[in-house]
Amino acid sequence: TVRWWWPGNAVNKMQIEKELRAFKKAKFSSVELQTLTIGLPEKHLEKNEEQIFRVGEKEYFENIQHVFSVAKDLDINIDLTMGSGWSSGGPFIKDFPEKQLIKSEVEIMGPANIKIKPPDISEPAYVNKTNFIVNNTIGDFDKNTKLEAIIFAKILPSKKGSILTQLKDVTYLFDGNQITLEVPVGKHKLFFIYQNNVSHNTLGSAYSGSLSKSLVIDHLDNRGTEEFIKRLGELWIEEIYPNKPTNFFIDSFELIGELPWSERLFDAFNEMHGYSIKPYLPLLFKKNGESKYLYAIFGEEFSFRSQNNVRERVYEDYLLTRQHLFMNEFLLPMKNWINSYDIKLRLQAHGGYGNYLDSYSIADIPESESLFAGGSYDFLKLASSAGNISNKKVISSESFIKIDFNYDRLEMKDYERLAGNAFSAGINHIVFHGYAYEYKY
């Protein structure tokens, strides 16, 4: 398979046919079409918005129909990326975008009897750092915050960072304007914890309207999945009929959040683990949020420590809850919908909130990649192992990716080495990454 990048809908039928014939001549049996704006200058995107940002419009589907027509004559299978860019979302997502918990805090010395109003809440630190790496990944800070909990904790000094103990949910003491507290002797903190939208934009989306905003869905709530299917999936099925792709492809997720959240998480956590997560929420925050773009640089250091491994135990339960929701609220409903049209799901599970082995396993074609985790043998084995235990005959990998400003530096020996590494790790289908539609700007 070759991944075929289009500059949105800035394409023409003559060039489409020319490039499909080139794929056939190069012995590719299938083509995956992915519309992207990555690599195009921002000024060019703004100037040519009407030509590029037309994915999902009538003229885009006319070009897709032409792809199917030519591919049928050439005996080439066509896969379609589910949407434009990654992760799943678009400018049409209004009701159920990706959510997070954020916090503000007040330090208090006791003993004291005090009245405190919630301090101002500001944009988390991970946002600017993430946007420095990938421009405009996170959009404007969502000021429409919802107070979810107020937690009171005692602080114990430590050379390795503050320890939180005696955590209590004191939300019930809040009168809507302020909270009145009897503070015992010692150093304490009061945490105001809010839910809001991450404002995470789908990276590289060429969907109509994406130039300004293209929100990623809440992958932990099936209402987000349903919004995506209703506003994108069903439209695509209708517009490309009677054609259909061999596979719908869902790219890696790279989900982001200060503390990734969903409205369903409180209840799901209680049901799964038999206790409330609320008092322990301050322990779950990390200094740089949860951003895959930052982990390699800053690591995953937590903001606070605990005694008796409380933080580690609660965080593990939180992860299990998140994995459960990701599987049952997004992956399975999406797969079932795709399969209902006799189309297969090709899935890169990494970067999401699921257990990777379980997530890869539900795909019809589990797919790894040679960029995530540096394309290490062990990482590639995650997809192939999951495919083997779930009896999947095809296990693919997005291959021949090189982090380099000169992409022509790959020589034949590099292709042989990278392909050999994939095959030795159990990959049996190479996705060539990739071929860019010939576009002059």
Where are these regions (language model features)?
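N-terminal-proximal low-complexity accessory segments that begin disordered
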Residues: T1-R54, L357, P366
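Catalytic domains of carbohydrate-active enzymes, especially glycoside hydrolases
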Residues: Q15-I38, N63-V70, N243, W337, ...
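Aromatic/His-enriched, Gly/Pro-containing loop or helix-boundary segments
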Residues: S29, L33-L74, T81, M109-I121, ...
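Mature extracytoplasmic enzyme cores
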Residues: V11, Q15-E17, A22-A26, S30, ...
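Loop/turn elements at helix/coil->beta-strand transitions in domains of secreted/extracellular proteins
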Residues: T1, A26-V31, K72-D79, P242-T246, ...
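Hydrophobic targeting/anchoring helices
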Residues: G90, F249, Y341-Y441
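Short, acidic/polar
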Residues: N9-F23, I229-I237, A349-Y356, F379, ...
